[in-house]
């Protein structure tokens, strides 16, 4: 919204704005609105160095099933985006048979219950005395990420996962539980993607590691 106000006031002449803010200029003849395709993606990045996920990483597939990505695209991006199931930019060379976690709330609950989670009286799953509860951190100043995180938390609570979105000016990477990541691989995926998900790579804030 701040950029929109700056554009309207003449303080700035060019800016990248959200799809919602872009609506303020589509009928204004003094502005030209360009739709730009990007390789950006957004997703929940788990901190696998955190003890909670070391104990409960088997709940992550259920979390993926519980999130309606298309609803996020439609409501937050006003349809200006596509559903993503991985970090690589979609193109004609993609393998369309990759593992996908399409929106399926019933499947989410099934995965949890098979793994030994039981639904508590408060509507939240628990196991061994521990609630399935975690916080998704969002960097301050990005309304799109904040909105995506809020919708994800709402959808997760509908299946019995107590997720909370927290907007912060500074992120404690080592001690956080999860983060609403924003990244992209517009060119060489070996460079842009492995630095985030490769074992011991400099930008691998999640501690993710897969020998395969």
Predicted segment positions?
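Append "and occasionally in soluble cytosolic enzymes with long acidic Gly/Pro-rich linkers
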Residues: 55-154
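Extracellular/periplasmic solute-recognition and catalytic clefts
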Residues: 1-50, 167, 178, 182
